[in-house]
Amino acid sequence: MSLKLQASNVTNKNDPKSINSRVFIGNLNTALVKKSDVETIFSKYGRVAGCSVHKGYAFVQYSNERHARAAVLGENGRVLAGQTLDINMAGEPKPDRPKGLKRAASAIYSGYIFDYDYYRDDFYDRLFDYRGRLSPVPVPRAVPVKRPRVTVPLVRRVKTNVPVKLFARSTAVTTSSAKIKLKSSELQAIKTELTQIKSNIDALLSRLEQIAAEQKANPDGKKKGDGGGAGGGGGGGGSGGGGSGGGGGGGSSRPPAPQENTTSEAGLPQGEARTRDDGDEEGLLTHSEEELEHSQDTDADDGALQ
């Protein structure tokens, strides 16, 4: 017959391994449930190293943390002796559990039996308060890397007229080159027109010189023709024949004049014809002089641009 060894009552070791493998059983009906019953229930999850039953709660000390967590998962919320058990890890206090009121020093001991209620609350309060008071491990601060400041040199704006002048000169050169190209083409056209005008003026001058020479060579013949015409109009056919004879004599002494001039001169008096010829000569001369002055001005402008 084998005797079952009871677990010890030691459940208050302070080493981390013992704390992490300890189970707290709350809301326990200790009037009906004994220490042996608690050991029987929790021994199926692993070896129970210690068990202590107190008024309304109990502690179960396992030798392995894995066994303690398995017992918490398996027995939490179980109804035992008409009360629902509140089981969790002793080293991890439940956040929603209210802290027990501390009793007076006279109520700590009740005869021979030691009151673990005050002991448990006071012990874990001190334990977690001590852990909270521990200063955390100082984390080494990252040394900030000093970056060299980039200094931007301040450049003062100096007002200078040189670039503006150069720009103006360049634009002037480009515009002047374009104008020179245009003027060269225009000058070429003007030159061709002037040559044509000059040739026309030369032809007109030669014609005028020819007319003037003819008039100086035969001034009497023209008067006779005029007199014969007048006599023929007043006296009849005899004087008309004389006028025709005079006209024939004049024709033999000089070359025949153009038909337009003879007809116009015959229809007009001698004074009016002469004034008309002089006016035509003066108009042609003034026109030719203006054209020559204009050609000289354009040649001077072309030379200045080149």
UniProtKB/Swiss-Prot annotation:
Subcellular location: Nucleus
InterPro entries for this protein: hnRNP_C, Nucleotide-bd_a/b_plait_sf, RALY_RRM, RBD_domain_sf, RRM_dom, RRM_HNRPC/RALY_subfam
N6-acetyllysine modifications at: K44, K165
Positions carrying N-acetylserine: S2
Biased composition (Gly residues): 227-252
GO cellular component, one term: nucleus
Tissue-specificity statement: Expressed in heart, brain, lung, liver, skeletal muscle, kidney and pancreas. Weakly expressed in placenta.
Residues in cross-link Glycyl lysine isopeptide (Lys-Gly) (interchain with G-Cter in SUMO2): K4, K94, K99, K159, K165, K179, K191
UniProt-listed CDD domains: RRM_RALY
Major place of residence: nucleus
Residues covered by region (Disordered): 215-306
Domain of life: Eukaryota
Self-association state and partner proteins as the record states: Identified in the spliceosome C complex. Interacts (through its RNA-binding domain) with FUS (through its RNA-binding domain); both are components of the same RNPs.
Main function: RNA-binding protein that acts as a transcriptional cofactor for cholesterol biosynthetic genes in the liver. Binds the lipid-responsive non-coding RNA LeXis and is required for LeXis-mediated effect on cholesterogenesis. May be a heterogeneous nuclear ribonucleoprotein (hnRNP).
Protein name stated in the entry: RNA-binding protein Raly
Annotated source species: Homo sapiens (Human)
